[in-house]
Amino acid sequence: MSDDLNDEVFKAAIDTWGEEAQVGMCIEEMGEALAAINHFKRKRIEKDKLIEEFVDVYIMMRQMRFMNQHLFDQIFRFKVNRIRHKLGLTTNPCIDLNKVKQNEG
């Protein structure tokens, strides 16, 4: 999957339908994924259908990132580093997330 080609699609979707509509679509896709998880747990759908719903959420999350890429990436790195620290994979303490957000503002 080429990120440049995907970014072109994400930009076109946001330009065509607007950020507010795409946030709404993200909420809708997350709801469908939640329902699919419950159906999968009760063996009402196959794994491929569950993965399909996850992909829909992933596409929408990529659009959410596209709208706020710098802040999104900063917070993502913070969260991954926090997990890394909890797992004992690093001794570096996590920086304060509020400082990350203040640097953005």
Range-by-range predicted roles:
Residues 1-105:
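Flexible "arm" and connector segments at domain edges
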